[in-house]
Each structure stands twice: as structure tokens, then as C-alpha cells.
């Protein structure tokens, strides 16, 4: 099962569970459900289409239920003291004119749902400063977005024992350990390369920095592999990895990237 699996992540998670396997770290960026995509063919052919086949337009209720099920799946396959690194951001869709449309709320609703209805809580929040800002030229009151967030989820029962890659810097005579400073601020490129298949990818540079902070052992799993940035970074470090991706075209794109390494 290692490598890219061209299937829904829930199928992959079930297979991992059925085989009695565990992953050491989950690192991913899910669809944000910003509603930019549409079943309208004219809209799908514009810049608003973020993915080649996924319609990023669930209702908030559907998206929250979907996220809850996803984290229940993570709980079933993540090893003891493992970590979930979950990149999310708020919406920027200004094309939706419905009065009740509030794109900024969904990220916080997701966090609330995860910490109240699953085994996980937030241990840390990493600010990812991108090299290129995302403009808001069509908005008179929204600021230009330069950062996204990576939420560090761990099991509530493991909040004091979950593992990071922080190294011991010194040990006092009393036995007290002092660790190196690892800051919750990361600067990395937006993505590795632009493509029409997925306009919401993160860069392998970001993945490399996150792995340096949190990877300790085991297989890294990305349930939304996209064009392969997580796999590329893991290959560069000699780390075993596993990914799921529903788009056949994106899987082929990722495999070609990996062959170029």
C-alpha cells in the first residue's frame, strides 16, 4: 500500500485498519470547502475551479460530518503518541452573494467539531508564511492574505506524551531536560509548480520543514495527496510514505514528479 493509492482516503484508511497497520504521522491539506467549484461547466472552466474532479461545495453540515468521520479514521490508524498536521485556511470566495454565506467561519467550525466530537485536541498552531501573498483585489475590506495555518492535532489522552522531533539541548544536574527552540512560524513557498489539476497544493519545502519538526518514526500518510508534494519530501528524506488521491490525473502527475527525483 505504500506510495500513491488512486482511491478515496476513507477506502485507504479502512484497508490500513483491516490490515492492523498504523501510521506514524498524518500530514495533509484537505479540501477547504470554500465553494469555489461548481457543477456549472462554465464555472468549472474558469480560475474558480480548484480541483480537476472534486466539487468543493458541500454544505457546512455535510463538511463538518465528513471531517468528523475523517478524524475518527485517523484515530483508528494513528500510532500511539502520533500527530496529525492539518493545513487549513479561511475562505476568500467573493463570488457568492448569498447573505448567509460566511466563508471565514468554516475553519473555526471544523476546529470546534474536531475538539468536541473526536478523540483529538489542538496541541499547537503553526503559522505558514507564504512567499507570495494571495490578493483580494475584488474586496474593499478584506486584507491581503499572506499566511495559512497548520494545526497540530493530538489525542486528548496523549497531550502530555505526544512526540516531536525536538532535540535535547542540555540536561541539568537535577535531570531536567532542556530542548532546542522550535518556533511555530514557518516560511515556505506556496507550491512547487502551478498546474491545472489542483490549484490548492502546498510546497514540498513546507513538508520538509514540518517533517523536521514532527517526524520521529513510522509511515507518513497524506489522505489528500494531490500532485505529490508530501511524497516528494518524504522521498528526499528517505521516509516511507502513503497517500490517497481520487483523481487519476493527479496520481499520474505525482508519479511523474517522483520519477524525476
Language model features: what each stretch is:
Residues 1-253:
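Core catalytic lobe of class I
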Residues 255-261:
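Short, conserved SAM-binding/catalytic segment
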Amino acid at each position: 500500500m505504500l506510495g500513491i493509492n488512486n482511491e478515496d482516503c476513507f477506502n485507504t484508511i479502512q484497508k490500513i485498519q483491516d490490515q492492523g497497520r498504523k501510521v506514524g504521522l498524518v500530514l495533509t491539506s484537505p479540501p477547504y470547502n470554500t465553494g469555489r467549484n461548481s457543477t456549472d461547466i462554465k464555472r468549472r472552466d474558469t480560475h474558480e475551479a480548484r480541483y480537476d474532479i472534486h466539487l468543493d461545495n458541500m454544505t457546512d453540515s455535510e463538511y463538518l460530518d465528513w471531517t468528523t468521520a475523517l478524524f475518527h479514521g485517523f484515530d483508528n490508524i494513528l500510532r500511539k503518541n502520533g500527530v496529525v498536521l492539518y493545513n487549513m485556511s479561511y475562505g476568500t470566495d467573493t463570488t457568492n452573494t448569498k447573505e448567509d454565506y460566511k466563508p471565514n467561519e468554516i475553519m473555526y467550525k471544523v476546529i470546534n467539531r474536531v475538539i468536541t466530537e473526536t478523540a483529538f485536541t489542538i496541541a499547537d498552531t503553526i503559522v505558514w508564511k507564504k512567499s507570495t501573498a494571495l490578493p483580494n483585489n475584488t474586496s474593499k475590506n478584506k486584507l491581503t492574505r499572506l499566511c495559512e495555518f497548520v494545526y497540530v492535532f493530538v489525542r486528548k489522552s496523549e497531550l502530555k506524551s505526544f512526540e516531536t522531533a525536538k532535540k535535547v539541548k542540555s540536561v541539568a544536574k537535577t535531570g531536567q531536560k532542556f530542548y532546542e527552540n522550535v518556533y511555530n512560524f514557518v516560511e515556505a513557498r506556496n507550491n512547487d509548480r502551478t498546474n491545472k489539476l489542483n490549484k490548492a497544493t502546498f510546497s514540498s519545502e513546507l513538508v520538509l520543514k514540518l517533517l523536521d519538526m514532527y517526524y520521529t518514526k513510522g509511515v507518513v500518510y497524506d489522505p489528500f495527496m494531490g500532485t505529490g508534494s508530501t511524497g516528494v519530501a518524504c522521498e528526499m528524506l528517505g521516509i516511507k510514505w502513503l497517500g490517497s488521491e481520487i483523481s487519476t490525473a493527479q496520481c499520474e502527475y505525482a508519479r511523474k514528479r517522483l520519477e524525476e527525483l
